Regions:
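Aspartic protease
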Residues: 2-4, 8-10, 16-103
Length: 103
């Protein structure tokens, strides 16, 4: 049984058309989109401060040790011939660069 779905997606800085191709994890159990904070910094994505932090909880209900989500980025996401402007919450994803939730 297939447990993970990975896609090659283009991600561009908004209004700069300067992008990269990255493998993203498609997660049907998540409704939001996330980008790893180290990846966002490494590629110079512009961080936008959230008005209210988003508390992150672990599966067991405890607060995540990395703390709350306080920033997001806006990017152009490109898959095949489709381009969509999206916002992703910035957090620590470990070995995964981007998680795309199912909206």
């Amino acid at each position: 049984m297939l447990r993970e779905v990975w896609l090659d997606i283009g991600v561009e800085k908004v209004d700069m058309y300067e992008g990269i191709t990255v493998k993203v994890l498609l997660d049907s159990g998540v409704t939001e989109m996330f980008i790893d904070q180290k990846m966002a910094a490494r590629h110079g994505f512009r961080l936008q401060k959230l008005e209210r932090p988003i508390v992150v909880r672990n599966v067991n209900g405890t607060n995540n040790s990395a703390g709350a989500i306080t920033y997001q980025v806006e990017v152009n996401m490109c898959y095949k011939s489709h381009i969509e402007r999206i916002r992703m919450d910035v957090c620590n994803l470990g070995k995964t660069d981007i998680i795309l939730g199912m909206l």
